């Protein structure tokens, strides 16, 4: 924050509309985790030169965040806070900052991957659909790649939670949840591109390179370039990502842990990621 700036909050903190109640140590710790994840998100968005204003700056097109916890009545009834996006207001349930709760939710919903930062990336993807795709000349191309977003969203959610993802969903979708509706497919794909760019930028910054002894294993040398340029060269991004995740998975297996990257990038999924990348850099 500049010394002469009237706003005492940094670019990331100024996007928080509502913080959790701070009456418990758990909520204080949760708020810190939420702000840390949001700060990393904001850094990435600015690095990609994406439009980013608060609702105080642009009431109709800005974005803000509220961090809310479930309400419990005097008789013990719980009113759930749903994580989601609505017209530029992103709500994150404070419970998602609790590692135990989040892991339980991951297992209950049969997800291979569920992180606090991933929630931010997913929900901001919904926001950027409104800004970059809706009412734009990209809309018809979006429908060709992802499907028609005019399909009933509430019904799609009901079907997904009652019946789950269709068989062999991995052939066409990055995650089971992406099968729910074109909006969710887009948001999951958006989050995935952000995962890729952030991890590759970090790997490059610390000098990660791979030169295996075997000829049948991938090599990796990541050139220094700004995130927007990295996304703009999408084919190179995918090649570097394949090599990096090969290494990541082998390292975590060596530690006796699950794969760090439990995803398959099929041909149709790559084309969806390509569409997202093109929208990011347009």
Q: What feature does the model see in each segment?
A:
Residues 28-99:
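Auxiliary, metal-adjacent structural segments of Zn-dependent hydrolase domains
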Residues 1-25:
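Cys/His-rich short segments
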Residues 58, 137-148:
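Short, glycine/acidic-rich hinge or "gate" loops at secondary-structure transitions
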Residues 114-135, 187:
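Active-site recognition of the HExxH zinc-binding catalytic motif
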Residues 100-120:
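Short pre-active-site segment immediately N-terminal to the catalytic Zn-binding motif
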């Amino acid at each position: 924050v500049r010394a002469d700036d009237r706003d005492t909050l940094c670019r990331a903190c100024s996007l928080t509309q509502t913080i959790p109640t701070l009456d418990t140590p758990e909520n204080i710790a949760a708020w810190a985790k939420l702000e840390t994840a949001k700060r990393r998100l904001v850094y990435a968005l600015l690095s990609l030169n994406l439009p980013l204003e608060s609702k105080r700056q642009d009431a109709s097109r800005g974005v803000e965040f509220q961090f809310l916890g479930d309400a419990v009545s005097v008789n013990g009834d719980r009113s759930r806070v749903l994580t989601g996006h609505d017209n530029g207001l992103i709500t994150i349930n404070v419970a998602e900052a609790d590692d135990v709760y989040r892991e339980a939710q991951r297992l209950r919903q049969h997800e291979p991957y569920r992180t606090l930062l991933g929630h931010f990336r997913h929900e901001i993807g919904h926001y950027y659909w409104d800004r970059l795709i809706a009412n734009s000349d990209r809309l018809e191309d979006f429908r060709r790649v992802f499907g028609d977003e005019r399909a009933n969203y509430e019904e799609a959610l009901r079907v997904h939670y009652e019946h789950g993802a269709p068989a062999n969903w991995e052939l066409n979708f990055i995650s089971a949840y992406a099968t729910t509706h074109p909006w969710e497919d887009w948001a999951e794909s958006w989050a995935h591109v952000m995962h890729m760019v952030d991890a590759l930028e970090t790997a490059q910054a610390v000098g990660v390179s791979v030169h295996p002894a075997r000829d049948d294993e991938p090599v990796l040398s990541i050139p220094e370039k700004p995130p927007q340029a990295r996304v703009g060269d999408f084919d190179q991004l995918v090649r570097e990502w394949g090599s990096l995740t090969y290494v990541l998975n082998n390292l975590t297996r060596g530690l006796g842990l699950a794969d760090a990257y439990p995803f398959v990038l099929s041909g149709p999924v790559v084309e969806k990621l390509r569409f997202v990348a093109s929208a990011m850099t347009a």
